[in-house]
């Protein structure tokens, strides 16, 4: 990705800290959107057996022009 910008990805995380769903909510060109969604799907969070079965949130990725 050669351009810069911001991409917001909505994620769903299970109790094991795994991202079970990710989709781009806004921003970026096709390259940035693909890279941000891939990075979100590969993210891991803390395991919490007492957490809700599913939690949702967003991750904002900021791309710097290269």
Regions found by a protein language model. Name each.
Residues 1-28, 40:
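Short tight loops/turns at secondary-structure junctions
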Residues 37-66:
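Short, positively biased Gly/Pro-containing turn/loop motifs at secondary-structure boundaries
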């Amino acid at each position: 990705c050669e351009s810069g910008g911001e991409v917001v990805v909505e994620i769903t995380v299970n109790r094991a800290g795994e991202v079970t769903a990710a989709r781009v909510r806004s921003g970026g060109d096709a390259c940035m959107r693909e890279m941000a969604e891939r990075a979100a799907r590969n993210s891991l969070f803390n395991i919490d057996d007492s957490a809700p079965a599913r939690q949702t949130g967003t991750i904002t990725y900021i791309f710097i022009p290269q």
